[in-house]
Amino acid sequence: LAYEQTKEGVFKEAALHQVPSFKERLIKRIVVDHHDMGFLYTPSCVAAYKLTGDKLARETALMAADNLMGRFQDRGEFFQAWGKLGNPKEYRLIIDCLLNMPLLFWASEETKNLKYRETALLHIRTSMKHVVREDSSTYHTYYFDPETGAPLRGVTAQGYRDGSIWARGQAWGIYGSAIAYKYCPNSMYIESFRKITACFLEHLPKNLIPYWDFYFTDGSGSPRDSSSAAIAACGMLEMAKYLEPEEAKDYIKTAKRLLKALTKHCLYRSSEDTNGILLHSTYAKSSPYNTVKDSGVDECTLWGDYFYMEALVRLVAQWEVYW
């Protein structure tokens, strides 16, 4: 993103310098037995190839796509997020994985192999069918029967409890439904986007910086998750490209409001103490009802910084999306 906007070689070289390590990670199997190949390899290697034609970046991104394909479960038609394949305790998808699908769409376009695309579409359909509740809030994760593939139940991992609204999960739903429509222009994804976005906006506190879970409201003193607002803004700006002008204008206006709030309340304005950009993100917050330990609470996060920058770029440039 920095190189695209400035054309300064220092940013380009710093990014390309990372590509060999991304390939090495796959070859040596360094924490790659999970679904997050798109998050790792789309804004790095796919972006590098699109912008510079770097052949190693292309090769590495295709390796990552193949690694992700290995996690697809035919019984249930979804990508298993975590754990040993087929383990009943981990036979589930998570809403985050919608952002991993563009890696497969890119691989399909790049290789002319439709299997990548077809598999991504199956996962998207399964996800949107099961993680979105009747009130348009979302589950973080959803379990399936490993023997039959039948849907079982929605539960949380990083949210406050199973029935609450994990803020970042809701934001993934916003961006994920926009991406779904980009690659499969079915009106049902626009309708899902509208409803998921409305639910997100209805639960925002006064200063527009989401609490880590929407169970919490103003006065609770609970940590925020600024990254959720940045992700949601990106999703609104993406979907605006496919909507009628008046509706698109409303979502663009809302995205700008979120970004102004992030800039006012969360932008780190000093070069001391941290190399982060966006304060007040939360990776995982423990609760009496979830399974995580406190990790990255009220800190800068890689994805918070990235999606904040992406949203800003979307506002100032005709940007070719990495996703």
Q: Where in this protein do the model-derived segments appear?
A:
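Glycan-recognition and catalytic cores of secretory/periplasmic carbohydrate-active enzymes
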Residues: L1-W323
